[in-house]
Amino acid sequence: MLLAEIISVGTELLFGEIVDSNAAFLARELGARGLTLHRKTVLGDNLERVTQAIGLALSRADLVILGGGLGPTDDDLTREAIAAALNETPTEDPGLISWLEGLYTSRGRVMPQINRKQAWLIPSAEALPNPVGTAPGWYVRTAGNKVIVALPGPPREMQTMWREEVLPRLPLPTRALHATTLHTQGIGESQLAELLGELTRQANPSVATYARKTGVDVRVAASADTPEAARELAAPVLDQVRQTLARWLWGEDTDTLAGAVTRALDSRTLGVIEAGSAGALCTLLADEPTFLDAAVTQDHRRLITLGLTPVTLHAQGLVSEQAARELAAGAREHLGAEVGLAVVTAVQGERAGQAYVALDTGNAQHTAALNWPGNAEQIRERAAVLALALAQRSLTRQEVLA
């Protein structure tokens, strides 16, 4: 079993100023190729701490991947840290210097002297070409038969180099991995785990649960000598999980909840009216071909022109089931869609956390409600997901699970 660790380097990552999307990408990539990731570390731009982290990682793992810290400035210290951890001395590589100078010349510029450190190499390192940036990576084979990979921080550069330069060099496991992720909605992770029972405690195939914004995911994975054998090993457990969770399932693997709604619409167009959710629902639907039109507003006068009646507004308020029903019907009538979906949400005041969603198909209406206090972003996200879940389950004639 090949063990891997990820070390993300950057004070901006440590303080949360930038989300570490690189580590998430690498974790998925490692898992898909049968490598076992057992630790992720985030460190600021500190030479001593990064050096120590590399040494510790090498004592535990076969593969250590560092992201970030390959720029030209004084606080870009990944090269120095790897060299210190391996007790090697970096020197300028003439070929890399020539490549960097040519890169700047092609852009009509002269290479700043500060960029010369990006041409450093240590004896055990091989330079990884960077086709979209100025920071070459490192591929290091240690005396202890371990591998260190250093990649730049910008995601576009890192992902390109990982696929084109790192993967062909990695000693990947010979055993094959087959994994399927099932998406559920309307059931909590603890209840789901109880239903799965002993399945979550077996090793191969393994069954694991993950809470996400759109519900709870269940990953079934098996490893074997061949892809076919791994698929066959996973199949009976996967079927059992599907049967156990059938009433909550909406998709698998790369499916999105918005995509599931599109499939359920079956070529019918969808109109959306949002009040209080700041376009959160429209953002999720933006790339879907059946998404016809939308209105995002909290202005009462505008909402009245879209179907909200003054009687409902004054008697029950904007954040009410009846208001959602009227606006869902209004999405059909005023936006010219075949199906209308509306969400009304309160993100502040006494009713903060309350939301109502409604779906109007022309033949029937369906509603669901939410009461989940949190910050404004969380409330809007939950309301948008609830609206999609309502649409998917109603259009496929499933029980609505708010």
Curated annotation (Swiss-Prot):
Disulfide bonds: none annotated. Signal peptide: none annotated. HAMAP family: CinA_B (MF_00226_B). Belongs to the CinA family. It comes from Deinococcus deserti (strain DSM 17065 / CIP 109153 / LMG 22923 / VCD115). This is CinA-like protein. Coiled coil: none annotated.
